[in-house]
């Protein structure tokens, strides 16, 4: 298992929370991050998933720009 970090981001591109994802693969981390994002209401800008210093996925909602 690896510890991925999932940063939930609001519409102003501010981190509103960080979730630790204990999963085995990048695909599992992406899936869990999407589930968390759609279950939450305060992360309307998107999310980023990181494994150490490697960006695994960046998801931005249509109104947010990175």
Language-model features and meaning:
Residues 16, 31, 59:
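Short acidic, gly/pro-rich beta-turn/loop elements at beta-sheet edges
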Residues 5-7, 32, 48:
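Generic alpha-helical hydrophobic packing signal
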Residues 24-44:
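A short, charged, amphipathic alpha-helix used as a generic interaction element across diverse proteins
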Residues 15-24:
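A short, exposed loop/beta-hairpin motif centered on an aromatic-Gly-Thr core
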Residues 39-66:
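Short, mixed-charge low-complexity intrinsically disordered segments
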Residues 1-16:
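Short aromatic-glycine-(Arg/Gly/Cys) micro-motifs in beta-strand/loop hairpins
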């Amino acid at each position: 298992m690896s510890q991925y970090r999932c940063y939930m981001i609001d519409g102003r591109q501010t981190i509103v929370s960080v979730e630790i994802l204990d999963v085995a693969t990048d695909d599992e981390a992406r899936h869990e991050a999407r589930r968390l994002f759609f279950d939450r209401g305060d992360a309307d800008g998107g999310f980023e998933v990181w494994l150490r210093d490697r960006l695994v996925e960046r998801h931005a909602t249509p109104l947010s720009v990175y």
